[in-house]
Curated annotation (Swiss-Prot):
Catalytic activities: 2 a quinone + NADH + H(+) = 2 a 1,4-benzosemiquinone + NAD(+); N,N-dimethyl-1,4-phenylenediamine + anthranilate + 2 NAD(+) = 2-(4-dimethylaminophenyl)diazenylbenzoate + 2 NADH + 2 H(+)
Species per Swiss-Prot/TrEMBL record: Alcanivorax borkumensis (strain ATCC 700651 / DSM 11573 / NCIMB 13689 / SK2)
InterPro entries according to UniProt: Flavodoxin_fold, Flavoprotein-like_sf, FMN-dep_NADH:Q_OxRdtase_AzoR1, NADH:quinone_OxRdtase_FMN_depd
Enzyme Commission (EC) number: 1.6.5.-, 1.7.1.17
Keywords from the UniProt entry: Flavoprotein, FMN, NAD, Oxidoreductase
Cofactor(s) recorded in Swiss-Prot or TrEMBL: FMN
The protein's name: FMN-dependent NADH:quinone oxidoreductase
Keyword hit for Flavoprotein: yes
Taxonomy of the source species: Bacteria, Pseudomonadati, Pseudomonadota, Gammaproteobacteria, Oceanospirillales
Pfam families: Flavodoxin_2
UniProt GO MF annotations: electron transfer activity; FMN binding; oxidoreductase activity, acting on NAD(P)H as acceptor; oxidoreductase activity, acting on NAD(P)H, quinone or similar compound as acceptor
Residues that hold FMN according to the record: 9, 95-98
Enzyme class: oxidoreductase
Length: 198
């Protein structure tokens, strides 16, 4: 089993979502001792944000790309290959100011590639990647799940579904900034849920 871990907390392993990710990976490894784990920490190893050069590289034909554009394309394809190689994806997902971390958006922008991970057809967009389980460990300071203020959950579902991955499960730890008692209970419930789903 190949596990791809995506951590997006700006606090690295000190983030609440990262702690939940580590617990999930430990549970998966206990169930699958031979599993290999690929960790991509977007805080310690950030992905460049899109700019004109990077977008141009994606849309320039392979035979016409400069050396710089070839490197940009190769970097993007390497991220996509990590997804293709994974049997299970574990994503740590904080909410910052009602959105996803900017470093996670950069990862998405390098993975969502027309003609590579999705394509447009007469019937609409079609994902090109093989479906696989994704566990999203969502940590929030307040309580937002199921409300109109939660723009993050539908966005992540939309992104993965757009590239062909629809088996996406969320585990929420909310109210983490609403006092120590609330935080401890929320994290305990989240750990219990992720263990039950492993």
């Amino acid at each position: 089993m190949n596990i791809l871990v995506i951590k997006s907390s700006v606090f690295g392993d000190n983030g609440n979502s990262s702690a939940l990710v580590n617990a999930q990976v430990d549970a998966l490894k206990a169930k699958h001792p031979q599993a290999t784990v690929r960790v991509r920490d977007l805080s310690t190893d950030p992905i460049p944000h899109l700019d004109g050069n990077r977008v141009s590289a994606f849309f320039t034909s392979a035979t016409q790309r400069t050396d710089e554009q070839q490197a940009i394309d190769a970097f993007s394809l390497a991220l996509i290959d990590e997804i293709k190689a994974a049997d299970h994806i574990v994503l740590g997902l904080p909410m910052y100011n009602f959105g996803i971390p900017s470093q996670l958006k950069s990862w998405i922008d390098h993975v969502a590639r027309a003609g590579i991970t999705f394509r447009y057809t007469e019937k609409g967009p079609q994902g090109l990647l093989e479906n696989k389980p994704v566990t999203v460990l969502a940590a929030r300071g307040g309580i937002y799940a199921g409300t109109s203020n939660d723009t993050v959950t539908p966005y992540i579902k939309l992104f993965f579904g757009f590239i062909g991955i629809t088996d996406v499960e969320f585990v929420f730890a909310e109210g983490l900034n609403m006092g120590d008692d609330v935080k401890e209970k929320a994290l305990a419930v989240a750990r219990s849920e992720l263990l039950a789903s492993t």
